[in-house]
Amino acid sequence: YVYEYEDDYIGDIGGDVKWSVSPNLTLDLTVNTDFSQVEADNQRINLTRFSLFFPEKRDFFLENAGFFSFGGGSSGRGGSRMGGGSTVQGFHSRTIGINANNQQVPLYGGGRLTGKVGKWSIGTLIMQSGSLESAAGSEVSPSNNYIVGRASYDVGERSRAGVLFTNRQASSTDYNRELGFDGRWGINDQTTVDAWIMKTESPHLDGDDFAGQIQFDWGSPRFQVRGAYLDVGDNFNPEMGFVTRTGIRAIDSSFYWTPFFPDSRYVRNLSPHVMYRHTIDRGGELLSKYAHLDWDMFLRYGDKVSVAHNRSYELLELPFQISAGVIIPPGVYEWGEVNLEFQSDAGRSVDGSFNYTTGGFWSGDRSEIRVQAGWRPGSRLSFALSLNHNEIDLPEGAFETDLASLRADLDFTTEMSMRSLIQYNSQQDMMLANVRLRYIYTPGSDLYLVYNETQVVEGSGLVDRAVLFKATYLLRF
């Protein structure tokens, strides 16, 4: 084949200012915010009908991110989805500067104020993005203004109440707003109740735009109990947050028992536990069920052995294309699977894990193998290998998926380091490479040399290649 390419040389300059307004309050200002040195996202295989949640990796948004945290409970925000449940997050900073197609959008700049004022924890953020155009000149993403306001008040030692407001606005007819209230009631050292409620406003949606959750947690050294109820309206649309599934009501529960064996030479403790999630639509029809029974055994020297059994129920209302040419028809599906897992102590110079899952899957069967291995030959060099292989056999068609990554980190000196990540995703037919060289020439001042490449394994070949150089200099005043 003949590869036609176009070279683009782009330069820009930006800056950040950090000002300690008070001992507990910090103001950050940024102009032409740049994230070229940020590590690439970890590739994932998606065998569900729902969008995947990717964590924030950009330092500017990770710094003081806790001041924008909303909700408190864990079953309805962040984390992994169980049995078709919904992940809900009031504010997710990845919505700023990254569009729905995972494309970088230029950021003109903005400001952030975070910290403590008495019993108040506050976080405010204002950012302005530019527009993004395609190669043909059409607008892919419009310029947007983003505003986030978060305040939380401590009530005693264990309780708090707070409010969250977000606003994304491109024009008078293109906007999204969200208002939320949350609270935590710490009844005692063992018992907490978390609750939140949110409402969104979008010009093209009207009514049924609320979401809320209440969660109960009780824990002791040997027992942990959790119960949660989640309600998400059909038109709930947090464009500056994240929601996996709307129009549902879900009950989520779990029970953990953790017996310890101080006299055993081999077993430190066990952690048998059960989880159950029950999801219905707004009319009361059952959408999904998920039951998880697990037996974890933690060994004296840091290793872990686990055996689990999962049962799933899914109501599929629309055809679901799970792979190219493989479409699962609407209907009710039930299946079970068994999972075996071994993890070695991560503190060793050589560590790893092995995970094997086999059983039913929608209308057929699935087997999955996941292997991870790490090697640290010295204090300055480390390698991490991850492999994931799925074999899926359905009446509608059979297919396989593969996901692989190799990470290598090398610290030449305390001032110079290199971080490399190579990934392969068969679902996207992509091979990706991200190599970052960093040199700290004075404390707080850095030089970065970054190489990124994306290739289609079968087909057109090279998709994108970029070599980036970035210099930062810290001025103290």
Regions found by a protein language model. Name each.
Residues 106, 196-477:
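Exposed, low-structure sequence patches enriched in small/polar residues
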Residues 1-264, 309-314, 465-469:
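Outer-membrane beta-barrel channel domains
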